[in-house]
Amino acid sequence: MHELLLFASVPAHQHHELLQQLAGLTAMQPRHRLERRLIFKAYRKPGLINTRVGASQDLQGNEMQRLNKMLNGGMFYTQVVGPVSEADFGAQSSAASSGDPDAPMSGTDTGTNFEYHPYSYENQPWKLEFRDIPEAGTRSAVTTRLMASASLPKGDITTPMNAWGYSFVTEYVVEGDVFILNDIVIYLHRVLHYPAESSGSHEPRRQLPPFQQMSPLEKTGSYVLQASIAVQDGGNQEMMKTASQHLFGLREQLKSAVRLEQADRLSLDTRAK
Amino acid sequence: MSDSFNLPLRPLTEKRERPDPLPVEIAQINAQYGSFRDVTEDSLRAKIEADKNKDPWFDKEENDNASADEDTTERLDQLYKRRAAITQFALQAHMEAMFALDFVSLLLSKHTPRQAEMSMSAYLKQVAPLGSLNSEIVNPPPKPESAARDTKNVSRGWRLQNFNSAASKLLDSATRLEAEVASETRYWDEVLAVKEKGWKVSRLPRERQALGVQYGFLEATPIFRDRGLAALRRTNDGSLILDKGLIPLKARTVRVRVRSRGQITGCSKNQPASDNTESIESRILQARDTVYEEELFHELVREARILGSQGVTTRQNLVQFPVSEEQEVLLDLIDSDQISPENDVVSSNEHAVVADALAHAIRILLAYAHRQNLRRRTQLPTPLTPKRRQTPEYQLLRPVMAYLQHSSHVRWLESLLNDINQILKSAGITCDFTATPFSSLSLRRTISGLPKVEALVQEFLLPYESTFSAQLVTPQSSFRVKVRTNVTTPPLGTHYEISVNMPQYPDVRPPNRIGLQDEAASILTHFVLLDILTAITHAKGSSVKGIKQETGHLLTWQAAYPHNGELLALSSTGQHKKMKVSLSRHELTVRVYSIRGIDGFGKPAVDKTPAMRSQTWKCDGTPDQPNLMDFIAEVSKE
């Protein structure tokens, strides 16, 4: 599956106005969305690489070749995205006082005193989102990249991710509004950071701090407008062309409000060095 | 703005001191008309009149008229001559222009010989050397005083005239602008009035100068969605008109009629047209209603096409579906002023309520479909694929048909069970029938994340189900009928699910799913019959008490062929008796025969003997009939 994108930067003072304009354009109310995003980095597990180079007699089967390619191919950062709601933030304060022994405790978690509260990490649904580095050398004025998404089991995600060869790096929150215009998803969002953490934890948070304590990554509070369209078969030139034409149409429509443009390819690099 | 000031636009014409013009004028009059004696008021008036009537081009026309009389050859001749003359004039003009060019070139050749040479004619080059003509500025002799004054006067006159015309042009445009402002104000007032009523006023996408009002439905099919926008145009006097382009202005509406046995027995009411049809508000409302109705009919036809297998037929402007064997519903799109067409007269208003309810139902369902469209549109889209998604047909007819079909089946079953109940009651048997029609509908159910309205409508899109249950005569015997109607998903149509609990006949099971009414009726009556038989065989213990003293002992009935309704009583005296019970929707009959013996196959050889006793109970319940148990006791006596 491929994804075509256009981006624009929206200063904070224009945010409200643009929300209204987009609501008018798409004839729908904005869908507010809050997402926890965990970043995982792939690492090479020792002992898994068994390339037998030079043995020409040892004909590798197709399967074997593919497996080797997969194992020795590029390593990527991937994101794990979980939808949360505003009520989930700051739920820890009530949790600290009410020690409920019957709460579902997670056996793996020993360090923190994790208790049942409105935000349940154990029931947090997750989605794995893989994004390749945007394609290079395309003459078209949109960012195109390979993408894939998959649903993951609920709850503690680090264990399965570790088992698949990914280690947890960091996490952040994305706050924004979604609009749908035919096939285009318009996402007006910004990145929020957690308040400065005391210890360098290597686990995703089990509780969320109060929402007011979240600070935007961009200090001015500006937003990013992202218009994306997904194409099932990236090899189908016809469809890719249609999709980018849809995006150009949107760019033309929003011309007087924001300037949608291609993103810098290297800034969207997801390869792990 | 408040204190307006007047700006004089016309030039002031000052009266100047003139020398007395009388002697000049007298001389002029003498020259024009001769002696003063001939100049009378009458002759002057006549002259003025004549001048007035005379066309300035009159003389020429006279000439033309004269020439028109000439015949064609002469005219052709003249045409050639004139053409020749024109050509000659043109040539002359050309020549003169060339002379002038030569002259100027020669003059210039003194200063810029190279350039001037280019525009010189060859002849001139031959005869005159370059630069042989010079010019210099000389001071003209001073003009005489009178000439200067004349020039001044003329220019002054010109200027005055120009001022005058400019002033009148300005004044004209001022009045025009004033009218324009007035009508523009009126236009904007009306536009604002429309906007204040809550209509969405916007610029037209194609015609960016014009304003439009949006009255349509955003979630409608694209063709109808785009029709929901009309331009608000201004007439010359500034009033607003709604310009819908090529779409006819007539209001149209979907009419629902019910036809029973070939007669129209119900027609949905039109909503009354608003009284002031001229106001822009009512025009917009009417346009909105019309676009809704037309979309409704469009969707009805679209849905009707896929329902061909269920008896729905479509004509050019009519959708028709059967409810039962003798009743059908007709839907058509009519102009709203055409209220009752003369060809089919509404014979009765028996089903007017049904027709009205249907009319409302399909409109509510369309609104629901619009909401569903919005829901679908605002979901995250699926990735682009070459295959376009087809919008499914809305559910408009299907829920309505299902409801009608279901309620007709339920009513039939209810009446059947009531009839049987009546018969049994008149025979003194008490059964307990309970009916819960539309038990599947629970209007209080709320689905999380759905608005109340949508949850309410959604109830009617699910398959309908009604349940009937009955406690029969024999304890622990009961049956239960579920009637399900399904129009959207297979299995389509209505079917009956009957479950029976009969301890005496544990191996009797009804078919799984019954589609036909007759079949269901026969199965149900059969079960009731079996139950009555069981009751009769068990009757002895209970009913015996009253009669015991008289007779001493009674026969015991046994079910010989229960599925045929036959009972047998064997007596020690050899006087066997046979009882045949039959139950139908209309009556319960019990016949008792006496038989002499049983033949080799265990079949009683009865048929020759006449019936000994027989009793029939009907549903109207004749009062002085014995009750069934008494009758049984009676015939059981040996």
From Swiss-Prot, chain A:
Q: Which residues cross the membrane?
A: none
What GO cellular component is one of the record's annotations? mediator complex
**Record-level GO BP terms:** regulation of transcription by RNA polymerase II; termination of RNA polymerase II transcription
Q: Which UniProt keywords apply?
A: Activator, Nucleus, Transcription, Transcription regulation
InterPro entries linked: Mediator_Med18
Q: Where in the cell is it found?
A: Nucleus
Record field: compositional bias (Low complexity) = 90-106
Keyword Transmembrane appears in the UniProt entry: no
Q: Which Gene Ontology MF annotations are present?
A: transcription coregulator activity
Top-level taxon in the UniProt lineage: Eukaryota
Primary location class: nucleus
Q: Does the keyword Magnesium belong to this entry?
A: no
Chain segments carrying region Disordered: 90-114
Which Pfam families does the record cross-reference, listed alphabetically? Med18 (PF09637)
Q: Which family does it belong to?
A: Belongs to the Mediator complex subunit 18 family.
Report quaternary structure and partners: Component of the Mediator complex.
Function recorded in the entry: Component of the Mediator complex, a coactivator involved in the regulated transcription of nearly all RNA polymerase II-dependent genes. Mediator functions as a bridge to convey information from gene-specific regulatory proteins to the basal RNA polymerase II transcription machinery. Mediator is recruited to promoters by direct interactions with regulatory proteins and serves as a scaffold for the assembly of a functional preinitiation complex with RNA polymerase II and the general transcription factors.
What is the name of this protein?
Answer: Mediator of RNA polymerase II transcription subunit 18
Q: Gene encoding this chain?
A: srb5
UniProtKB/Swiss-Prot annotation, chain B:
What the protein does comes down to: Component of the Mediator complex, a coactivator involved in the regulated transcription of nearly all RNA polymerase II-dependent genes. Mediator functions as a bridge to convey information from gene-specific regulatory proteins to the basal RNA polymerase II transcription machinery. Mediator is recruited to promoters by direct interactions with regulatory proteins and serves as a scaffold for the assembly of a functional preinitiation complex with RNA polymerase II and the general transcription factors.
Q: Does the keyword Transcription regulation apply?
A: yes
| Stretches for region Disordered | 1-21
The identity of this protein, by name, is Mediator of RNA polymerase II transcription subunit 17
Source organism per entry reads: Aspergillus oryzae (strain ATCC 42149 / RIB 40)
**GO process terms (BP):** regulation of transcription by RNA polymerase II
Gene Ontology terms, MF aspect: transcription coregulator activity
Q: What keywords does the record list, in alphabetical order?
A: Activator, Nucleus, Transcription, Transcription regulation
Residues that span the membrane, as ranges: none
Among the Pfam families in the record, one is: Med17
- Tell me which Gene3D superfamilies the record gives: 6.10.250.2620
Q: Its principal location?
A: nucleus
Family of the protein in this entry: Belongs to the Mediator complex subunit 17 family.
Q: Name one GO cellular component term.
A: mediator complex
The gene from which this protein is expressed is srb4
Q: Does the record's keyword annotation contain Oxidoreductase?
A: no
The entry's localization annotation reads: Nucleus
**Assembly behavior:** Component of the Mediator complex.
This protein's source sits in the domain of life called: Eukaryota
